Amino acid sequence: MISTVVWGTGNVGRLAIRAVEAHPALQLCAVIVHNPAKVGRDAGELGELDRLLGVEATDDIEAVLAARPRAVVYAASGDVRPDEALADITRAVRSGAVVVSPALYPLYDHRNAPPEFRDPVLAAVTEGGGSLFASGVDPGWGNDVLPLLLSGLGTTIDVIRCQEIFDYSTYDQPDSVRYLVGMGQPMDYEPMMLMPSIPTMVWGGQIRMMARALGVELDEIRETSDRRALDTTVTTRTMGEFGAGTQGAIRFEVQGIVEGEPRIVIEHVTRIHPSCAPDWPVPPDGGDGAHRVVIEGRPRIEVTIEATDEGENRSAGGNATAVGRLVGAIDWLVEAEPGLYDALDIPLRPAIGRLGRKQS
């Protein structure tokens, strides 16, 4: 069994606890928390299982890493604390652990990552012998392994378009939704998510990886964006009120330009309520979220994935798929050489040993 730590127990971490516990090759050995109120609580409770797992949460990072766990699922956020997340991840890699994480988007495409992100991790790999695989949903499998798999079914391909279409009203991340994405802010507020070069920083690596896998050279990466205001005030269950006249929806594209044309496109359509921008793309079933890949060519191929978890919640379902991809890579990484890995390095593997396995 591969001794595995889950670091962080928020929206991603509680799903990671469940994924590690369900994996037949992994053994949950520790859970690291930042909130003092969670110290001493059982991992089963934090993972919202109906049973205890016999692993108590701790905030003693040094003690956990000193025990030399073989793997760490780093589930703490890197969106609003990238420096701290990078320090945590390099610390775990330096301890010799295989680390998987959805944090730190620049490291999804590590070959082109800024030196300030890449170099500390490479130094930690050299010093401690650990590894890192960073990936998610979108950016993540929704615009790397999935579109590339589908492209292999085509005869000719004109455009690969990856879409995330989501209603954020079910999210429980008010800081990210209000300040990074800008929902509920005045229309003259410039959300960080749409600042020039930020979409490319987050999603450009996915464009580059797809281009590399497809054997094409990019002329450049372009960005487009649009915003819409709410017509009426809306109230969400988890994040409160969003006022009429404030930002209610954004739409942007990150485009990989090949021979002057946008051939690889990542598009996001994000709303805080379905009433905003009804003329923009919506999930095919009218639900609150979907990931879609459209291959324009011969044949035309369209695949939509709608994942749900935690009471039919699609944001939780999306997070669960990211966790599944990461946790499912741990045993492969343990057998591989130490290093930095990306989605093209790591095979998408079947759920060996998990078919029919029940989890409460």
From Swiss-Prot:
Q: Which CDD domains does the annotation name?
A: nat-AmDH_N_like
Which top class of enzyme applies to this chain? oxidoreductase
Q: Which reaction does it catalyse?
A: a secondary alkyl amine + NAD(+) + H2O = a ketone + NH4(+) + NADH + H(+); a secondary alkyl amine + NADP(+) + H2O = a ketone + NH4(+) + NADPH + H(+); serinol + NAD(+) + H2O = dihydroxyacetone + NH4(+) + NADH + H(+); serinol + NADP(+) + H2O = dihydroxyacetone + NH4(+) + NADPH + H(+)
MF terms in GO: 4-hydroxy-tetrahydrodipicolinate reductase
Q: Which Gene3D superfamilies match?
A: NAD(P)-binding Rossmann-like Domain
UniProt note: pH dependence: Optimum pH is 10.0 for the oxidative deamination reaction, while the optimum pH of the reductive amination reaction is rather broad and between 6.5 and 7.0.
Q: How does activity depend on temperature?
A: Optimum temperature is 30 degrees Celsius for the deaminating reaction. Is not thermostable.
Any idea of its EC number? Answer: 1.4.1.28
Source lineage? Bacteria, Bacillati, Actinomycetota, Actinomycetes, Kitasatosporales
State what protein this is by name.
Amine dehydrogenase
Q: Which GO terms describe its biological process?
A: lysine biosynthetic process via diaminopimelate
The record ties this protein, via Pfam families, to:
DAP_DH_C, DapB_N
What is known about what this protein does?
Answer: Catalyzes the reversible oxidative deaminations of a broad range of amines, amino alcohols and amino acids. Catalyzes the reversible dehydrogenation of serinol in the presence of NAD(+) to give dihydroxyacetone, ammonium ion and NADH, while NADP(+) shows a slight activity. Is also able to produce 2-amino-1-propanol and aspartate by the reductive amination of the corresponding keto alcohol (hydroxyacetone) and keto acid (oxaloacetate) in the presence of ammonium ions and NADH, and that of acetophenone from phenylethylamine by the oxidative deamination in the presence of NAD(+).
Q: Which family does it belong to?
A: Belongs to the amine dehydrogenase family.
Question: Subunit structure, briefly?
Answer: Homodimer.
